Amino acid sequence: MRIVDLYGQGRPIFSFEFFPPKTDAGENKLMETMADLKSAVEPDFVSVTYGAGGSTRDRTHGVVTRIQDELGITGMAHQTCVAASRADVLENVKRLVGSGVENVLALRGDPPETDGDWRPPSDGFSHANELLEFLTAEFDLSLGAACYPEVHPEAISAEDDLAWTRAKVESGAGFLRELLQ
C-alpha cells in the first residue's frame, strides 16, 4: 500500500520506525519482534532508517523487504542523499522498487562532522527537495519528507524552515513526517 493513500482516511495512522540491525541475528530478532507487534497493534506501516555513512546502510533494503514479504506490513525505506551521488541513489532506489518497495522517505541526512562547511558530492544533492525532484522524475513512488515542528536546527528562522518544507512538498513529497530535536 502507498503510504500517501493512508492519509485523508479520517483515522490516526500508526507506524514504527527501526534502524536495521548490524547482524543477521539482530535482523532475525527484529523480525520476531515485528511479528509480535503486528499481532498486538497492527501498524499501518514500518519505516526503516538508512545510515548515510554507517554500517547499517546496506541492510535497509533487506529489512524493509523482509517486513513486507514475510510479515505483510507496508514498508517505507529511508533514502538519504548527504553522501550519495545521483548514481548511488538511482541504483539503491531501483533495487528497492525491484523488490516491491513503493514508499520512500527522502531525507538529506546528517552531514558528517567536519572542520569546515559540509559540501555534497559534485554529482549529488544539497537538500532533500533536490532528492525529491530527482526521485519524482525517475520513479512512481509514494514519497515522504521530514518536517520540523520545533524548527530545523540549521534554519535561519521559523519562516525559513517553513519555506524549505514547502519546497519539499512542491518537489514531490506526498506526506510529511515530523522530526523533533
Question: Predicted regions span which residues?
Answer:
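Short catalytic-loop micro-motif centered on adjacent basic/acidic residues
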Residues: 47-48, 75-79, 175-180
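Glycine-rich, N-terminal phosphate-binding loop and its surrounding beta-alpha-beta segment
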Residues: 67-82
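Acidic-and-aromatic substrate-binding clefts and catalytic sites of carbohydrate-active enzymes
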Residues: 25, 52-58, 82-87
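Alpha/beta enzyme core
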Residues: 3, 9-13, 22-46, 70, ...
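Flexible loop residues that form catalytic
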Residues: 51, 109, 181
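N-terminal active-site wall of soluble small-molecule enzyme domains
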Residues: 58-70, 88
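GNAT-family acyltransferases
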Residues: 17
